[in-house]
Swiss-Prot record:
One of its GO terms (molecular function) is ATP binding. Its EC number is 6.3.4.5. It comes from the Bacteria. GO terms for cellular component: cytoplasm. This is Argininosuccinate synthase. L-aspartate binds at residues 121, 125-126. It comes from Nitratidesulfovibrio vulgaris (strain DSM 19637 / Miyazaki F). Keywords: Amino-acid biosynthesis, Arginine biosynthesis, ATP-binding, Cytoplasm, Ligase, Nucleotide-binding. Its main location: cytoplasm.
Length: 401
């Protein structure tokens, strides 16, 4: 780093890693450290985390409730796109990083800091997500990533450093490396590093094991306006409240469990177990509503963008021009995605069983198997003949041998 670092803003959880990082940055750079702890609905008690940061050496500690902004400006736009990474993962961790990075930059500007810092390791995707976001929002800021530069290599090293510098240690131990926010909870490490090993019971936090789900189905309705959920069971709610409500409902039915080996952006295959109960229900309902009120060609074109959009989110390009351009097109397609979906929740599944929309493109007279005057079956012959010109010509010229 060419310029002098006098103040750093650190993404701080209050755990061992970021507490050690806080002290390490202060000692190594001889600079002031400001912390940001973001409440993204992770259901953790954040009382006292600011006091711990100050005791560990921070000059100022921000603890911010970002739940509504997270749901409104990050989760919901992503949900409108139908994003799903590698056909399975609903991007619960990925979508949280841009908001944290944005707030790091905002605070760095307000505090006159020269750098921001994070606690992501050198093997994971999060380091990329944080730093690409900072690059996009504040290219002049330096980024400090201690895990890539310090000589602390293990939990034992971290613990020794903490004891040496009087950093309070938690006595609890975790079976897995967990990351949670209002959209999902992820589990990695431990026994999960063996891809053949079934996840243990401690990997159930947001959703019950499907064997323990009720034996009776539950019916719910979700109302959408312009692709965003606005009400559950007829009750209007804020974006964050909708996610929380669907987490509770979907979680008790064991919905949203995923166990997969995915391709990290850094080139490593990684096994993760994810719980996304509310997001899964929302994803299924949204997709179903599109079927009745979204133009076919618009839908198919949008569907071609889903893998690319999902990769942009997963790889950390939320603030990149291509993601913003795709979002503009997606949002245009969502202008008519208005209506209500009825779902049946049962034993780990969410089944759409009804849908209605003021913008419906479904025409009963055209779709019915009964005789009607609207559709002339004879018209199909000319349509098929014209559609067959290309393949008939190919067969006559290329396949004649």
């Amino acid at each position: 780093m060419a310029k002098a670092i006098k103040k750093v803003v650190l993404a701080y959880s209050g755990g061992l890693d970021t507490s050690v990082i806080l002290k390490w940055i202060a000692v190594t750079y001889g600079c002031e450290v400001v912390t940001l702890t973001a409440d993204l609905g992770q259901e953790e008690d954040l009382d006292g985390v600011d006091a711990k940061a100050l005791r560990t050496g921070a000059s100022r500690a921000y603890v911010e409730d970002l739940r509504e902004e997270f749901a409104r400006d990050f989760i919901f736009p992503m949900m409108r796109s139908g994003a799903v990474y590698e056909g399975r993962y609903l991007l619960g961790t990925s979508i949280a990083r841009p908001l944290i990075a944005k707030r790091l930059v905002d605070i760095a500007r307000a505090e006159g800091a020269q750098a921001v810092a994070h606690g992501a390791t050198g093997k994971g995707n999060d380091q990329v997500r944080f730093e690409l976001a900072v690059n996009a929002l504040a290219p002049d800021l330096d980024v400090i990533a201690p895990w890539r530069i310090w000589d602390l290599r293990s939990r034992t090293d971290l613990t020794a450093f903490a004891e040496q510098h009087g950093i309070p240690l938690s006595t609890s131990s975790k079976q897995y490396s967990m990351d949670r926010n209002m959209l999902h909870c992820s589990f990695e490490g431990g026994e999960l590093e063996d891809p053949w090993c079934e996840p243990g019971p401690n990997s159930h936090v947001m959703a019950v094991p499907v064997e323990q789900a009720p034996d009776t189905p539950e019916y719910i309705t979700i109302e959408f306006k312009k692709g965003d959920a606005v009400a559950v069971n007829g009750e209007a709610m804020s974006p964050a409240s909708i996610i929380r409500t669907l987490n509770t409902i979907g979680g008790r039915h064991g919905i949203g469990r995923l166990d997969m080996v995915e391709n990290r952006f850094v080139g490593i295959k990684s096994r993760g177990v994810y719980e996304t109960p509310g997001g899964t229900v929302l994803h299924i309902a949204h997709r179903d509503l599109e079927g009745i009120c979204m133009d076919r060609e618009s839908m198919h074109l949008r569907d071609q963008l889903i893998p690319r959009y999902s990769e942009a989110v997963y790889n950390g390009f939320w603030f990149a021009p291509e993601r913003e351009a795709m979002q503009a097109f997606i949002d245009k397609t969502q202008e008519t995605v208005n209506g209500t979906v009825r779902l049946k929740l049962y034993k780990g599944n969410a089944y759409p069983v009804g849908r209605t929309s003021p913008n419906t493109l479904y025409c009963h007279d055209l779709a019915t198997f009964e005789d009607c005057a609207t559709y002339d079956h004879a018209d199909a012959a000319g349509f098929i003949k014209l559609q067959g010109l290309r393949v008939r010509g190919y067969a006559q010229r290329v396949k004649k041998d």
